[in-house]
Amino acid sequence: MGGFVKTQKTNAYHKRFQVKFKRRRQGKTDYRARIRLTNQDKNKYNTPKYRFVVRFTNKDITAQIVYATIAGDIVMAAAYSHELPRYGLEVGLTNYAAAYCTGLLLARRVLKLRGLDQEYEGNIEATGEDYYVEPADERRPFRALLDVGLIRTTTGNRVFGALKGALDGGLDIPHSDKRFAGFKKDEKQLDSDIHRKYIYGGHVADYMRSMAEEEPEKFQAHFSEYLKKGIDADGMEALYKKVHAAIRADPTMAKSTKKEPATHKRYNLKKLTYEQRKASLVERLNALNSSAGADDDDEEEDDE
């Protein structure tokens, strides 16, 4: 009966050992998915595959249109949820409704960049129903592939809120409605009313109402920023409608104005030039000579 045989990590083993890619070792990139999102047909020359990349942090949502080159990925356009205060949404910048706004902003921005914003206006009124952009006579719609990275693609995930925003904005992204918020697995169809509620922040409004009734003190702390801005549960839908209209009116990225750096107090001596050092030396020598001459005069007076 054979027992456990320990692997002998010899010199030959270490010489032939091949490490995985760095971002695989760090657990940041799914290369199985990436190779399928970036590999293009060999008969399509200089035609990149565009990816609609969505990533989330604790306080921000990032949406980008990216394409791969040998030198590295190139970001063609980007939109962030921290831009939404410019359009009237100052709180709740990481929820499903904010993800929709970020996707919509990116779609309108990239279409304006390509000169397609007038031809493909998308779905102006968000109804919650699935939407596919129809090709126009002259130019085809801008096509991209959804890149979710390592996000778990559960039904109702915020990444699909960003996808819905990009679709309504006029981008052509292959998709299914099975992962949108409101899809019912038993009935195998999307409940557009539930999805519409999520797009306009209705789920947040419901939570505000229930918490205000059950735990008023916690409500004051949890929704303090909403209350400071004067946002209540009843005005949530109207707020998001204004934000969507403002995004469509001007999707361009605003240039940030940076302040001039403040002048800091110097605690170390400034380095002198050669001429300054030479002049300083002459001054010190003159001072020494004058002091030496004064001492000689004092000695002569004492002798007298």
UniProtKB/Swiss-Prot annotation:
Membrane-spanning parts: none
Record-linked InterPro entries: Rbsml_uL18_euk (IPR005485), Ribosomal_uL18_C_euk (IPR025607)
SUPFAM superfamilies in UniProt: Translational machinery components
GO MF entry, a single one: structural constituent of ribosome
Pfam families according to UniProt: Ribosomal_L18_c, Ribosomal_L5e
Subcellular location: Cytoplasm; Nucleus
Region named Disordered: 285-304
GO cellular component: cytosolic large ribosomal subunit; nucleus
Keyword Secreted applies: no
Keywords per UniProt: Cytoplasm, Nucleus, Ribonucleoprotein, Ribosomal protein, RNA-binding, rRNA-binding
Function in brief: Component of the ribosome, a large ribonucleoprotein complex responsible for the synthesis of proteins in the cell. The small ribosomal subunit (SSU) binds messenger RNAs (mRNAs) and translates the encoded message by selecting cognate aminoacyl-transfer RNA (tRNA) molecules. The large subunit (LSU) contains the ribosomal catalytic site termed the peptidyl transferase center (PTC), which catalyzes the formation of peptide bonds, thereby polymerizing the amino acids delivered by tRNAs into a polypeptide chain.
Record PANTHER family: LARGE RIBOSOMAL SUBUNIT PROTEIN UL18, RIBOSOMAL PROTEIN L5-RELATED
Family: Belongs to the universal ribosomal protein uL18 family.
Name of protein: Large ribosomal subunit protein uL18z
Gene: RPL5A
